[in-house]
Amino acid sequence: MLRLGSLASREVRMSNDYRFGIEEEFFVVDAETKAALRRMPSGFFDALRDRLGDSITVELLQSQLEMATAPTDRIGDALDELRDLRHIAGRVAAEHGLGFIAAGTHPTASWDNVRATKANRYDGLMQDLQMLGERNMVCGLHVHVELPDPDLRVDVMRRITPYLPHFIALSTSSPFWGSRQTGLMGYRLAAYDELPRTGLPELFEDNAAYEEYVAALVGARAISDSSYVWWAIRPSQKHPTLELRAPDACTRVEDAVALAALYRSLVRFLVRHPEHHRHIGAVDRAIANENKWRAQRYGIHGSFVDLAEQRAIQVRDALDQLIALVADDAEDLGCLDALLHLRTIPDAGTSADMQIAVYQEAHHRTGNRGEALQAVKTWLAHATLQ
């Protein structure tokens, strides 16, 4: 959970240096077999809390944990803190015969073989979601950017919609599900979007319309509050932020920070250019949904539908266009180098590309699917702590 403190005065509330924070979800695994845990061992989370404080929190399922940075306006601080969180948690895990994997899905985990975390919120969720809650064996990357004005948060949420598939394509890390290669580079959202109130947000005209939607659901007792709205991007219920939730968990910490730099820069660009996507409508959202699917299916190797040109554009070309769009903002925010790291991903590959390559090499060498999947898990556990 992001640790953004309350803002004390109107002057502070109305200022904005686009502070941001990053939340990463992880699978907790057996150190030897790399299998996802069924139950959290007694004392393990307490040991993590002793070392990391409230930077680490439990998740819906006992096989998962979340680590979060403190809010900052310095991209280097976020990178250093993410590395420290991973390394410290990794050392504590090793003392308990455990490890961590950062990926959108665990390659071999069986969703029907895990247990929910005991907590009032999670008990209620499992009662409501039933089997869908059990199938929520997925891990994502969440980035908060501070926008004190609620109307501005909803305005940016609407106008950023066409760019959400870019974040999905660049972060794909979930090509396996239940010991099978899915054929998708990012299977995570296929599973996650089984839940209600997921996917792309509706195109709310302003914060009043968004609050009316939330109030209707709360009044009908469909949800308790807006934290039960799980779109790919949403106004935070607890913090004065707009929270990006579209990306898969990133195996490489540098990729996570680069995506945070892109998101922060894009938010600033949209604030500075209120006319950009001002008249976004149903067709734009429909095209964004198509591109979301294409990002899940093909990752960085596919193409997006360009609505204005009515043609396909390669993802790497769309990425170049987006980087050029926000480069000035990234430079002003001091995160241009992190942003430019994204240009290395189409050539180096995402985590999904690496997992598939490891699987294919091991399968070619051994002829055994089980050993090939084990090689993928071993690579993931190692790369997560690099």
UniProtKB/Swiss-Prot annotation:
What Pfam families does the entry give? GCS2
Q: Which UniProt keywords apply?
A: ATP-binding, Ligase, Nucleotide-binding
The region annotated as signal peptide is: none
Q: Does the record bear Kinase in its keywords?
A: no
Reaction catalysed by this enzyme: L-cysteine + L-glutamate + ATP = gamma-L-glutamyl-L-cysteine + ADP + phosphate + H(+)
Q: What is its EC number?
A: 6.3.2.2
Gene3D superfamilies with a match to the protein in the record: 3.30.590.20
Which GO terms label this protein's molecular function in UniProt? Answer: ATP binding; glutamate-cysteine ligase activity
Presence of the UniProt keyword Repressor in the record: no
Q: Which GO terms fall under biological process for this protein?
A: modified amino acid biosynthetic process
NCBIfam families, per this entry? gshA_cyan_rel (TIGR02050), PRK13515.1 (NF010039)
List the HAMAP family hit by this protein, alphabetically.
Glu_cys_ligase_2
What does the similarity note say? Belongs to the glutamate--cysteine ligase type 2 family. YbdK subfamily.
This molecule's function is given as: ATP-dependent carboxylate-amine ligase which exhibits weak glutamate--cysteine ligase activity.
What's the protein name? Putative glutamate--cysteine ligase 2
Q: Tell me the organism's taxonomic lineage.
A: Bacteria, Pseudomonadati, Pseudomonadota, Alphaproteobacteria, Hyphomicrobiales
